[in-house]
């Protein structure tokens, strides 16, 4: 079995390739060619923390694996990662353990790739200004993926802890050469954006501003019914709400459950799964006036396909630590 660390994965990743693999996984899922149960969610430590168990089989892609992740929001106060995890791949023919990959970096990359795919199909082609609300680790992968699919000229950042936003602005400027600005008011930040990303652990909406025509939103933070990043009116007034999995999104996120309970949105008003848009079964953005929202909760098959990509790259480059059971 090959063990692949986060640092080793970092040197293997080509974001454009990861976006392609994520799109392939989404297409297979929406075509019902995978077995991807709704993930198990286990609250622990007085429900402050969450363990997520995410298995998947993709028959056509010959991939089998499981991801186990813990989300501990309080870790950031003691300088530790809020997301920890592992991904295990099994040999598709023999069922033997194939690889064990550090899971928090992989999660960041696949989260970014999902937003990259959504942005490719749903954002305006001439989108130039990106707003990111929440500047934790997940925002790094999302920014990189959006830069891969759109020619972004300006980045606007908002974070409750302002110094973290400034640190992220420096990261964006140094790594990507993009001008990045920290705003004190999330509503002002949202008002100026062509593409909005929310990646927080918020239980109440992170902005209240009415969305501008033509904007695209990637909402990736809310993964529990008790969590809500977007104001209900944003979901209600969007022209297209898109998800990875209708079943999972309706089961897991307050971003949809709350407006449904308030009578502002109906479950059958979800426009499409992202895989249906990739395959051409459903339309993506159709004009520059549409408001589009991609509500992401994650999807195990994407993790497994990205893990398989990293495993194959590791074999090619002789990277990783081989261990015997």
Swiss-Prot record:
Gene3D superfamilies: NAD(P)-binding Rossmann-like Domain, ornithine cyclodeaminase, domain 1. Keywords: NAD, NADP, Oxidoreductase. It catalyses: L-proline + NAD(+) = 1-pyrroline-2-carboxylate + NADH + H(+); L-proline + NADP(+) = 1-pyrroline-2-carboxylate + NADPH + H(+). One of its GO terms (cellular component) is cytoplasm. GO terms for molecular function: oxidoreductase activity. It is an enzyme of class 1 (oxidoreductase). InterPro entries: NAD(P)-bd_dom_sf, ODC_Mu_crystall, ODC_N. This is Delta(1)-pyrroline-2-carboxylate reductase. The lineage of its organism: Bacteria, Bacillati, Bacillota, Bacilli, Bacillales.
């Amino acid at each position: 079995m090959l063990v692949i660390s986060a640092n080793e994965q970092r040197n293997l990743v080509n974001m454009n390739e990861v976006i392609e693999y994520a799109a392939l996984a989404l297409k297979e899922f929406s075509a019902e060619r995978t077995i991807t149960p709704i993930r198990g969610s286990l609250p622990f430590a007085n429900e402050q923390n969450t363990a997520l168990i995410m298995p998947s089989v993709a028959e056509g892609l010959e991939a089998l694996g499981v991801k186990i992740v813990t989300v501990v929001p309080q870790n950031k106060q003691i300088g530790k990662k809020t997301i920890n995890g592992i991904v295990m791949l099994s040999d598709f023919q023999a069922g033997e353990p194939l690889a064990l990959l550090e899971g928090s970096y992989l999660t960041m990359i696949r989260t970014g790739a999902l937003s990259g795919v959504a942005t490719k199909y749903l954002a305006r082609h001439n989108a130039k200004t990106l707003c990111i609300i929440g500047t934790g680790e997940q925002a790094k992968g999302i920014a990189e993926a959006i830069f891969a699919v759109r020619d972004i000229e300006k980045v606007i950042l908002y974070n409750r802890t302002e110094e973290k936003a400034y640190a992220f602005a420096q990261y964006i400027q140094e790594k990507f050469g993009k001008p990045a600005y920290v705003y004190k008011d999330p509503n002002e930040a949202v008002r100026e954006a062509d593409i909005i990303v929310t990646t927080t652990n918020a239980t109440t909406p992170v902005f209240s501003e009415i969305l501008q025509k033509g904007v695209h939103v990637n909402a990736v933070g809310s993964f529990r019914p008790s969590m809500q990043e977007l104001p209900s009116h944003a979901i209600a007034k969007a022209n297209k709400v898109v998800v990875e999995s209708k079943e999972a999104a309706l089961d897991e996120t307050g971003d949809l459950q709350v407006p449904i309970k308030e009578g502002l949105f109906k479950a059958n008003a979800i426009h499409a799964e992202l895989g249906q848009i990739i395959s051409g079964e459903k339309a993506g953005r159709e004009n520059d006036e549409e408001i589009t929202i991609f509500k992401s909760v994650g999807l195990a098959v994407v993790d497994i396909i990205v893990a398989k990509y990293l495993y194959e790259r590791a074999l090619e480059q002789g990277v990783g630590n081989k261990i015997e059971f």
